[in-house]
A protein has these predicted regions:
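Short intrinsically disordered coil segments
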Residues: 147-149, 223, 267-269
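Solvent-exposed serine/threonine-rich low-complexity stretches and specific carbohydrate-binding patches
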Residues: 218-228
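Compositionally biased non-globular segments, especially hydrophobic aliphatic-rich helices
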Residues: 44, 130-133, 152, 213, ...
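Predominantly extracellular/luminal regions of secreted and cell-surface proteins
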Residues: 121-155
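Short, surface-exposed beta-strand/loop "edge" segments at domain boundaries and coil↔beta transitions
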Residues: 70, 141-142, 184, 260
Length: 281
């Protein structure tokens, strides 16, 4: 694995994700090799329970990596993913693994979140594959990455390097073009909280809509409560209507914190907010 990491040229860092290495040290051929070696190791100590448990516990990072990479794929073997998720949950409970990462997220909570967040939903988002026009563009490299990431149907993970689009020290705004007028009932934007990376939930989100892309009608303004926990969290900010709204364009305006607050160790420095997915139904 060390040789594969060096050969890939992909660096490791504190807020890394297995997804960063899906084409390097965690590419399919190497993952098959790692699993084969663990299969052999488990077989070799099958008659010795204490040693078997050690091998099974050592295998957990590979199992976690498989799950993380699988959720980023557009084509999924759902039976296989559910089987792996069930086994991972069974093992972390058996070995009483307390945390998943440096931010104390629970691995049992991760399994629950995985089923709710990353497994395909019955109702598809109307925003899937829609055109996104930025009124206040994302920061730096995220401007290019943001062309598709907000409407690709794939939710980001617990680190911002994975599918998230960020704005630093500013507000954000964009318009989603559904291509034609459609009846919609709700819009929801997904945000990331990771204070160790100076990523905070925004202060406010405003939704509006228009059939012509020019004359917008206010839908809803949502103020977000402050979040100070060290755990990585996700928050969906949603506007709903009891009656269908016929529209083609949906505008999302986000008011960011812009600076780290007084209680944060980065006080006075620019803060971020990150969005991954916008869901319209």
């Amino acid at each position: 694995m060390e040789g594969a990491l060096i050969g890939s040229g992909q660096r490791l860092w504190i807020y890394d994700s297995p997804v960063s290495h899906k084409y390097g040290m965690l590419k399919p051929a190497l993952m098959r090799r790692y699993n084969h070696l663990f299969d052999l190791a488990e077989k070799a100590v099958a008659a010795e329970p204490d040693f078997l448990k050690r091998v099974q516990r050592a295998r957990l990072p590979i199992q976690y990596s498989e799950l993380e990479i699988a959720r980023t794929e557009t084509e999924k073997d759902l039976v296989d993913i559910n089987k792996k998720l069930d086994l991972f949950e069974e093992r972390v409970k058996e070995f009483q693994v307390p945390t998943l990462n440096e931010r104390s997220n629970s691995p049992v909570d991760y399994c629950k979140l995985y089923r709710e967040r990353y497994m395909p939903q019955k109702e598809k988002s109307l925003a899937l594959g829609a055109k996104v026009t930025y009124l206040i563009p994302p920061t730096g490299k995220y401007a290019a990455l943001g062309k598709n990431a907000l409407v690709d149907g794939l939710f980001g993970g617990a680190t911002f390097v994975d599918s998230w689009i960020g704005w630093e020290g500013t507000d954000g705004a964009f318009v989603i073009d559904l291509g034609e007028a459609k009846e919609i009932h709700s819009v929801e934007t997904d945000f990331l909280h990771q204070i160790g990376a100076w990523i905070l939930f925004p202060l406010k989100v405003v939704y509006s809509y228009a059939e012509d892309g020019e004359h917008y009608t206010h839908w809803k303004t949502i103020d977000l409560p402050e979040e100070r926990t060290g755990e990585v969290k996700f928050r969906g900010v949603k506007a709903e209507s009891a009656e269908p709204i016929k529209t083609r364009y949906v505008k999302v305006e986000v008011t960011g914190t812009k600076e780290c607050p007084t209680w944060h160790y980065g006080v006075g420095h620019p803060s971020w907010f990150f969005i991954d997915e916008v869901i319209i139904k």
